[in-house]
Amino acid sequence: MSSAVMTHPVRLVQARELAERLGLDGLALDPEPDGPPSAMRTAMVAWAAADSAASHHLVVQDDVSAPENLVALVGRAAGRFPDEALVYYTNWHARNGGASRLAALAGAAWVRAVPDEFTPSLAVCLPLGTADDFRAFAAGSDERHDDELFSVFFRARGRMSLIAVPNVVEHIGTSSINGHATQGIRLAVCPTDAADAEPLLARGRVLEEPGWIPYMRYGEGYIRLVGQENGPDGGRGHHRWLDALPMTGLTERAVREAVAEGMPADLATQVAERFGPAFAEELWIHCLLLGRQAAEAARRLGDPGSPGEVPPDVLARLRDAAVSTAGPAGLPPERRPEAGPDEVRLMSAFAWTAVRAGEQWSPA
């Protein structure tokens, strides 16, 4: 497997340190550093750096942290899934983040990306032929976001990327050369250490179709519906959970009854005191729906397998990681800095009550 770090001269020192620490092959510099911001321009250099003798090529962006054995982890996963485009980071507030969170709760370690959102591109490994095809596809494009063009490319091929649910790659900082700073703090949906990631990536189950996906953005709950990519807007619109309920088979009455019966007043009050009552209710309903869908996905996945597969404690920590990010990810970007360790623990405890209620929920 060959590799490269995408970077810009303003981050050259940071990129060199990352490449040296991870044992990556070299740097892919923006060929027009004084031009308009364009991740795609640098991505073309990075994917062109693939070694023709390699079977796969890994491209990592410069604003990440990752374990020293990242190349080994990625290489083993590429051996397991030799024909797949593999993605190793997912934003905690994206639709694909919602898919990853749902997959973690269902007991899966990989999930198929949704077709109506960008493909997270902080750390991507492609088979060499796919990398060549992507470069040919992207040549001459006016798109400046490589993550957006990846999704257009994968949709055209009829197969989206495969996302690693345990995130060993983490985004660092809030600055953005490509204009994403307004999104605020952007972190991994399921932060996982390398020791836990190894059995998950090597032997964990794959969730190909998560069904409808609950996710939060700007303090509100939404649902990504099955097949919404076929809509007139390509599925890029956002459906509030209440508007989307009729397409899920659930009713508002059933949701309100579950809230009345299961939402703990003490924790709800504490979350409301810090972030407002509307956010507290939205977070609990979001996690209720998440628990419901995770239970459905777990049933479709079936028995987790023999004890020699992924250790139960590793799967439990992955579930904890997924729930721990639900609260801060759901906050509006300007309020995420208010979520310190105490607030994260509070929101996590609150979210777990909803997830467990959803997992046991049998709406009439």
Regions found by a protein language model. Name each.
Residues M1-V60, V64-A364:
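Peripheral/terminal regions associated with large enzymatic or DNA-binding modules
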